[in-house]
UniProtKB/Swiss-Prot annotation:
Protein name: Non-structural glycoprotein 4
Residue ranges, annotated region (Hydrophobic): 7-21, 67-85
Lineage: Viruses, Riboviria, Orthornavirae, Duplornaviricota, Resentoviricetes
GO MF term list: channel activity; metal ion binding; toxin activity
Post-translational modification comment from the UniProt entry: Mannosylated. The N-glycosyl content is primarily Man(9)GlcNAc, with a small amount of Man(8)GlcNAc.
Family matches, as SUPFAM superfamilies: Rotavirus nonstructural proteins
Organism: Rotavirus A (strain RVA/Cow/United States/NCDV-Lincoln/1969/G6P6[1])
Domain comment, as recorded: A disordered 28 aa C-terminal domain is presented to the cytoplasm by each subunit of the tetrameric receptor.
Lumenal side: 1-28
Length: 175
């Protein structure tokens, strides 16, 4: 029985559209006919597609408000696309999802900045320690005996009899 009433309803809508189109065609100055026909076709298609969909959705879903809201937003977005607009209507849920995504990305970037800042602070501290070590030792205080391997070399006061054993001695040879 429902199919029969849907068929009667559809035929009455088609009859209404045809009569509307005939009255538009009778006017000789009507230059916007293709646009009006396109709009009427879209409206009829949306009407025929959305009514059964909404009926099924309302019967099967527990949360009818969200379904109705989603259907209406989808219909308006379709109409906006057909009109040539690039903007779309978004629901609160979509806005909240986008906000959550933005907040998550901001947190990730803040953590990265924190890690980089910590690393930079550690590098600055390391450079400061290196600089302090270089600046504390004066040139006079550096023990070069370790560098040239002369730890066991004696000074002039430490030599026996005060003579340097490494100085060449005068040698006289017989001729």
């Amino acid at each position: 029985m429902e199919k029969l009433t849907d068929l009667n309803y559809t035929s009455s809508v088609i009859t209404l559209m045809n009569s509307t189109l005939h009255t538009i065609l009778e006017d000789p100055g009507m230059a916007y006919f293709p646009y009006i026909a396109s709009v009427l076709t879209v409206l009829f298609t949306l009407h025929k597609a959305s009514i059964p969909t909404m009926k099924i959705a309302l019967k099967t879903s527990k949360c009818s408000y969200k379904v109705v809201k989603y259907c209406i937003v989808t219909i308006f977005n379709t109409l906006l696309k057909l009109a040539g607009y690039k903007e779309q209507i978004t629901t609160k849920d979509e806005i909240e999802k986008q906000m959550d995504r933005v907040v998550k990305e901001m947190r990730r970037q803040l953590e990265m900045i924190d890690k980089l800042t910590t690393r930079e602070i550690e590098q600055v501290e390391l450079l400061k320690r290196i600089h302090d070590k270089l600046m504390i030792r004066a040139v006079d205080e550096i023990d070069m005996t370790k560098e040239i391997n002369q730890k066991n070399v004696r000074t002039l006061e430490e030599w026996e009899n005060g003579k340097n054993p490494y100085e060449p001695k005068e040698v006289t040879a017989a001729m």
